[in-house]
């Protein structure tokens, strides 16, 4: 992709998962630049300081108005995914949301319609490609350390407390 312009990325929400996204983008994906991060909590500014190209905002509308984003990732609590995604999609910004897309099916359908109307891509992030256990399993398979595989089944158990789902 030599000569192509960098994709300008913004984030809304910089809780625990944000550092994983920032690491993957900085270390594994060429031609992408984190230009802005928004979180209502001013103390989260510290988590953004190591990203030289990023400007920190506490107001979503101000970030959207001042930055010409190609993509925005919604990493906020589940209860506000709809509100934040709607702002981005109405601005014609390609939007990727951490799971779940919304808490109500009607809201998810509305976001899908907004994406179509505004020529934006809407996606939900479900992959675990860069999780350490998944990378280890992939390496074991690639190194053929398991022998002939007949069937593989994986179950992932984790729990979230109520704070995770509040919005």
Spans of features found by a protein language model:
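Beta-loop-alpha module in the N-terminal Rossmann-like domain of NAD(P)-dependent dehydrogenases
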Residues: 21, 55-114
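Receiver (REC) domain switch-region micro-motif
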Residues: 37, 72, 152
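N-terminal Rossmann-like dinucleotide-binding module
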Residues: 1-51
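Predominantly a Rossmann-like dinucleotide-binding segment in NAD(P)-dependent oxidoreductases
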Residues: 128-167
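Structural signature of beta-strand start/N-cap positions in the alpha/beta core
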Residues: 8, 33-34, 68-70, 94, ...
């Amino acid at each position: 992709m030599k000569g192509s312009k960098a994709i300008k990325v913004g984030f809304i929400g910089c809780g625990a998962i944000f550092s994983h996204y920032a690491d993957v983008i900085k270390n594994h994906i060429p031609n992408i630049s984190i230009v802005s991060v928004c979180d209502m909590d001013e103390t989260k500014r510290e988590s953004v300081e190591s990203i030289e190209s990023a400007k920190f905002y506490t107001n979503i509308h101000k970030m959207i108005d001042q930055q010409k984003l190609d993509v925005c990732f919604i990493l906020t609590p589940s209860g506000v995914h709809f509100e934040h995604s709607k702002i981005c999609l109405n601005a014609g910004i390609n939007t990727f949301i951490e799971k779940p897309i919304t808490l109500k099916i009607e809201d998810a359908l509305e976001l899908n319609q907004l994406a179509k109307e505004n020529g934006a891509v809407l996606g939900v992030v479900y992959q675990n490609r860069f999780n350490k256990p998944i990378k280890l399993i992939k390496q074991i398979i690639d190194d053929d350390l398991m022998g002939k595989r007949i069937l593989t089944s994986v179950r992932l158990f984790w729990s979230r407390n109520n704070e995770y789902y509040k919005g």
